[in-house]
Amino acid sequence: MIQYLTHNQIDKKKWDATITECGNIYAYSWYLDMVHPHWEALVEDDYQAVMPITGGKKFGVNYLYQPYFVQQLGVFSKQPLTQEKTESFLKAIPSKYRFAEIRLNESITFDKEVQGIEYHRNVLLDLNQDYESIRANYHQNTKRNLAKAESNNLQLVTTVIPYHVVALFTDNRGALLDKWGDAEYARLTALGKVAVQRNSAFILGVTEKGVGLLLCAAIFMKTANRITFLFSGLRQEGKDRQAMTYLLDQVIQQNAGQPITFDFEGSDDENLARFYLGFGGNEVKYPSYTFNRLSPAGKAVLKVWKGRK
C-alpha cells in the first residue's frame, strides 16, 4: 500500500537506504532538504519503493514542480521498476495537487503510451575501462579541442570553493540569463558546501600555469558508482583555450578504470548534447510527467503566470 507522508513523518534513515541502492544523488534526504526543505513523500511497504513529492502553492493552488539543481526524481525502488508500479505511484499523488510538471528518472520506462509522459536526453559515459580506450572513443572534434587545450599550458586546481564556481557563472553566461535569482544561487552555493562536507561532491577548476585567473570551474556530485557534472562556470578566455574540455577530460582520466558512470547531466540543448557526446558517452532518455486538473479559469491564470516566468 502506498502512503502519503508529510515531511516530519518521513524516516530519513530508511529513505536513504532505498536511495543508496538506486544511486541517484538528487533523491537523498539531505539533498532534498537543501533544494526543497519541506518535501513530502509517497512510500510503499516500509520504504521498499518511494517517490519524493516537491510541491508549491500559487494563487491558492497546490502544484508539483521540479526543484532547481535536480535533473531526475520520480519513483525509486529496491526491486526492478515496472510500468505498473510507476503508474501506481503517479496515481497515488494526492488529489490536492492540481497541476504538475515533474521529471522522473532513467530507470523508469513505459512500454505503452501514458498521457503526460515526455522524454528528455541525458549523456552517460562508462568509466570502467582504461583511459586510453575511453579517449580513443572521443569524437574527432573533441580530440582536436583537447589537443588545443593541452598546448595552452593549463593546469587543474583543487582550491576552488562553491562560491567561486557560482560567481564565475553569474559574471559570465549567467549575466545573460534571468532563469535564477539571488536566492537560487545562494541555495546552490549552500548545496555545494554541504555536499563537499559530506564527501558527496568535489570541486575543480582550471587556470593557466603561472596565472591565477580561473578559466573554468565545476561542481561534481558523487555517489559510490556515479559522478554527476552538476554545475559549471566558464569565462571567455577559458572558452578560447578549451578549458572545459580539459577539465572534463581530467576528471575522466582520474576516474577511469573504476566501476563508475560519468553523468554529464544533459542535455536537451543540441549544442550541449553534441559537446557531451563528443566524449564518447551514450544518449539515455528519461521521462517527465505533466498533468493539469485545473478548471478552465485556473488554466487561464496558469498560462498568464507561465508567460511571465
Summary of predicted features, one role per range:
Residues P37-W39, S95-F99, G257-P259:
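Short, high-confidence coil segments that cap the C-terminus of an alpha-helix
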Residues Q66-S107:
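A gly/proline- and charged-residue-enriched helix-loop-helix capping module
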